[in-house]
Amino acid sequence: MEVKGPSGRSFCCESEGQFKSCLKRHTPSLLLPSSWKGNSGSCLMAEALHRTSPTPNSCPLPLPLCRMSGVLCSRNLFTFKFSLFQLDSGASGEPGHSLGLTLGFSYCGNCQTAVVSAQPEGMASNGAYPVLGPGVTANPGTSLSVFTALPFTTPAPGPAHGPLLVTAGAPPGGPLVLSTFPSTPLVTEQDGCSPSGAGASNVFVQMRTEVGPVKAAQAQTLVLTQAPLVWQAPGALCGGVVCPPPLLLAAAPVVPVMAAQVVGGTQACEGGWSQGLPLPPPPPPAAQLPPIVSQGNAGPWPQGAHGESSLASSQAKAPPDDSCNPRSVYENFRLWQHYKPLARRHLPQSPDTEALSCFLIPVLRSLARRKPTMTLEEGLWRAMREWQHTSNFDRMIFYEMAEKFLEFEAEEEMQIQKSQWMKGPQCLPPPATPRLEPRGPPAPEVVKQPVYLPSKAGPKAQTACLPPPRPQRPVTKARRPPPQPHRRAETKARLPPPRPQRPAETKVPEEIPPEVVQEYVDIMEELLGPSLGATGEPEKQREEGKVKQPQEEDWTPPDPGLLSYIDKLCSQKDFVTKVEAVIHPQFLEELLSPDPQMDFLALSQDLEQEEGLTLAQLVEKRLPPLKEKQHSRAAPSRGTARLDSSSSKFAAGQGAERDVPDPQEGVGMETCPPQTTARDSQGRGRAHTGMARSEDSVVLLGCQDSPGLRAARPTSPPQDHRPTCPGVGTKDALDLPGGSPVRESHGLAQGSSEEEELPSLAFLLGSQHKLLPWWLPQSPVPASGLLSPEKWGPQGTHQSPSAERRGLNLAPSPANKAKKQPLFGSLSPAEKTPHRGPGLRVSGEQSLTWGLGGPSQSQKRKGDPLVSRKEKKQHCSQ
């Protein structure tokens, strides 16, 4: 055996294994029979195939009579010759004579050509028939296989090579059958490409029938046009259209050729039939096989087509052009859709259904051409057996072909839906269009089976089980369907239904729950407070904790006239003073304590008893307990603390100066009751004041816990002598930003060290007025003079020069007799405070009026729960 490469080097093989390995090394694609057998069935060992001459056409040594067949594939510039020898036992291999069979393949431009020559030398006596395929018999008239697989690829750029001579020994009287059906599947190159030119491939068959030297042989050439010999690589484009590669040889019908007759599938060459050869008779009708490709408008196969029906009954006419033609691609696509039920029938649970359907297209076509009388069941059985013996690498091309067909099917579905939307009503259809039920019993089971394609076929597995709808028109261009527009169409179809429901959902949160509204009303009523007083509800019950929140249905808006009258009363200075005078001292003491433990039941009983008493009776009732507690309590607790030590030093220095009173001093105070004036309040006041100023500075909040605060309860004057100023809070007690120790010390240094007695009520209520605005000017706070009975003026008033120097306008109150009081709500730096009880004296700089707000103070006091409405009316009448 000799294998010749492009460089002209010859390779000799000593054995069958060496021969196969040599061919594999120098051949890109090779497919050999499983065994090489002779007539006796023994394997042929080619020990001395080529030892005579290095030339390709040399004759080997004589060998025993045998029949051999082989398959050769060529690629690029390689040229191979495979010589098979079949000799009689008495024949001799003389040099110069061709005693065997030689096959060769090469390229000719864009067409794949092969020349077959037969030399029947020395073989007429035994009647042996040379064959070109494995597993054949020598019976005359039997359809034999020529080639198992011949993948022709595009040659590399270079000079065109002429066709190689392929010679085959044939007896003069024996038939030579050239069958186009391959017995094994095609093995294509991984990187192989087919010629881009479309058209038929010409196969030149040359027969030699002389006995003698090869050079004197008479040859007759016939051109066989075979459509599918133009092979296409996976995914390649042919004329702008994706063409699934044809897999197996499909040529003209099988025609038996007798002796000196050569029949072509399509036409003869230009030379015609030469040298007196008779024209070939027309092929028998029985030999004409119906092609497998169906028309584009062919419907799905009926169920009765399965079973004993023949392949011929289910086939259509073959296309005249190659597989790259768009019409051929479309017909293959329709066949693939028709074969899917058959594939599901044999592989119900396999994901290879689509790939197997692609595999059935060329296999069933070839079986139909080889044996038209073969039933469909037998053809499917042979195809399944061939599929099982196919390697995964060989199946790759079918998976890719199935992937393209799946894309075609998805595109067709989308086009059908669009056409239905255009023809149907204007409203959008439901997002999921019902699809046709797949044919065959096992179809529902395969719907859930995805198709696992090796390359980019995973996401497209869902569309594999869809049945083929009837086409409206032939698809002239195969392109991949864009998945995004399809999704947008489905999204738009789902959007309209929820639109009417969205406004209803957004209106629900706008409604406020009733319990939230009620909670808000309760909080506002608790903060504002005056709404309860406006309803006329007794404030005594509020003091006792028995007040219930008014219901919305019972609440009525207050009378504007009543509100204006209340504002008018609160704007009067005497009205607020009268209200403060009747506040229960026990209630104030418990209320201002750090941990109040109020007995509301006992307090309510006391208040009920006091409702029937007059103001004089109230004073007589409350004054003795106050005197006893004032004597028992320590004097330092009555003085207010200083903020720093410097102010206490100045206070101590001024205490000695107060021992000598100024006869011209006077204060705008009202006269004290007889019980108060009978005591030596001057001396006691000076003693208390001096002791108070020697104390260290303490914040009022800390002083409120001391017993002095509880002892310093207000003393109600007689009915004819009422205080005309609200309770006074000290500057130290308020502890506000305006109260600077420097300012206090500055005022003491100027000599304004006169002190006055502070009402205990105002002193105790100082912490309640910390929210009032601080109106202290930059001028120092004046000090009030001491109040003594002998220093009263003609009208019972006593004014200090410091007050006069500061322009303190003191006018008598219209509600009091022969009494003067400082103007309420004036813009003076400080105001004088009346004496509410004996012995309660504090420094003047601490006597900051907490009622500077005027009407605002009255409005705040209006809603104060400390004064009952009945007592307010009594004071208003006075």
Swiss-Prot record:
UniProt feature, compositional bias: Basic and acidic residues: 537-551, 622-631
Pfam families attached to this UniProt entry: NUT
InterPro entries given in the database record: NUT (IPR024310), NUT_N (IPR024309)
Family indicated by similarity: Belongs to the NUT family.
Compositionally biased spans, kind Pro residues: 278-288, 427-444
Designated name of the protein: NUT family member 2E
Region Disordered, residue ranges: 273-324, 417-511, 527-560, 622-757, 775-878
Gene responsible for this protein: NUTM2E
Lineage of source species: Eukaryota, Metazoa, Chordata, Craniata, Vertebrata
Bridged cysteine pairs (disulfide): none
Organism this protein belongs to: Homo sapiens (Human)
